[in-house]
């Protein structure tokens, strides 16, 4: 059974098909999942993710069931595999926002329903699908190729974008602080994919080098949820990595800025630049709804073929 845990498990054709279907559903809503049920499991708080999934299944004709950590026996020691067997047998889809990616893997092994990664410490694939739809809408993908820079932390967003760019054949540059590293295993996977797709991928510690000649600039919060006690240290380590007017001037003239939100002005992005690109950033957030719709339909179709 097909799950959506990481973009590593999806081909170029499948990823682009998801984005194209999302674009179609945005223009012409359809109730394609009448009476289907989505279980939403959250170990971490969420605004945009919960709204996107709950609205997506509802507008497609189904219903959502919200489950926080306090609602589950997992918090009392029940094995993940037992919870997966129960929930996976009762619903049509399971969406999970978890602290550890291993929880997703374990749940997917035992679930009879497809499992969707709505964020783990390693990957955030639904966000990248939303980003890709936004890039398509702003005409920043020429002949199937986008020129993208990621500036910031070597986190789940960076990992997911690295994988997507490698599979899709993009020109993709990463700039992270010197004492930060990309997972060697994820980097190796991306390099192998780049050989197949023709992607041009680079890694540096200089944001200006990464931004040169790019049409899309992506950044993310420096202090992720659960890292609040590391805020002071991380702000020092990321000094010089803010996306401001000077940084954007190095990118191509009409480059767009993407941010998965929440954004902290004065840290990863300046107030002026954020507001200048607010239209695209908030449309990026809205686009999560449509890519989730496309993803749910895809997984339902895959399950129907089994």
From Swiss-Prot:
Name of a matching Pfam family: OTCace
Gene: argF
Domain of life of the organism encoding this protein: Bacteria
Function, in words: Reversibly catalyzes the transfer of the carbamoyl group from carbamoyl phosphate (CP) to the N(epsilon) atom of ornithine (ORN) to produce L-citrulline.
Residues noted as binding carbamoyl phosphate in the record, renumbered to the chain: 46-49, 73, 97, 124-127, 260-261, 288
PANTHER family, per database record: ORNITHINE CARBAMOYLTRANSFERASE, MITOCHONDRIAL (PTHR45753), ORNITHINE TRANSCARBAMYLASE, MITOCHONDRIAL (PTHR45753:SF3)
Pathway assignment: Amino-acid biosynthesis; L-arginine biosynthesis; L-arginine from L-ornithine and carbamoyl phosphate: step 1/3
Binding annotation for L-ornithine: 156, 220, 224-225
Record-linked InterPro entries: Asp/Orn_carbamoyltranf_P-bd, Asp/Orn_carbamoylTrfase, Asp/Orn_carbamoylTrfase_sf, Asp_carbamoyltransf_Asp/Orn-bd, Orn/put_carbamltrans, OTCase_ArgI
GO MF annotation: an example: amino acid binding
Listed name of the protein: Ornithine carbamoyltransferase
Biological process (GO), any one: citrulline biosynthetic process
Species whose genome carries this gene: Campylobacter jejuni subsp. jejuni serotype O:23/36 (strain 81-176)
EC number assigned by the record: 2.1.3.3
């Amino acid at each position: 059974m097909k799950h959506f845990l990481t973009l590593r498990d999806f081909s170029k054709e499948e990823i682009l098909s998801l984005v194209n279907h999302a674009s179609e559903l945005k223009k012409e809503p359809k109730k394609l999942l009448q009476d289907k049920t989505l279980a939403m499991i959250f170990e971490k708080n969420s605004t945009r993710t919960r709204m996107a999934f709950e609205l997506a299944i509802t507008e497609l004709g189904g219903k959502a069931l919200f489950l926080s950590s306090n609602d589950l026996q997992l918090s009392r020691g029940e094995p993940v595999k037992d919870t997966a067997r129960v929930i996976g047998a009762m619903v049509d889809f399971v969406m999970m926002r978890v602290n550890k990616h291993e929880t997703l893997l374990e749940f997917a092994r035992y679930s009879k329903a497809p499992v969707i990664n709505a964020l783990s410490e390693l990957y955030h694939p639904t966000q990248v699908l939303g980003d890709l739809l936004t890039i398509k809408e702003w005409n920043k993908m020429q002949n199937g190729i986008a020129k993208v820079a990621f500036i910031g932390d070597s986190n789940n967003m960076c990992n997911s974008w690295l994988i997507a760019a490698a599979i899709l054949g993009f020109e993709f540059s990463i700039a992270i602080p010197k004492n930060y590293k990309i997972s060697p295993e994820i980097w190796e996977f991306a390099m192998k994919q780049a050989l197949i797709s023709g992607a041009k991928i680079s890694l540096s510690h200089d944001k200006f080098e990464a931004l040169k000649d790019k049409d899309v600039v992506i950044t993310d919060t420096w202090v992720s949820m659960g890292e609040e006690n590391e805020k002071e240290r991380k702000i020092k380590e990321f000094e010089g990595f803010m996306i401001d007017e000077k940084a954007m001037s190095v990118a191509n003239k009409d480059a767009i800025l993407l941010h998965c939100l929440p954004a902290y002005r004065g840290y990863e992005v300046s107030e002026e630049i954020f507001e200048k690109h607010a239209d695209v950033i908030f449309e990026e957030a809205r686009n999560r709804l449509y890519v989730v719709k496309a993803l749910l339909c895809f997984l339902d179709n895959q399950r129907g073929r089994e």
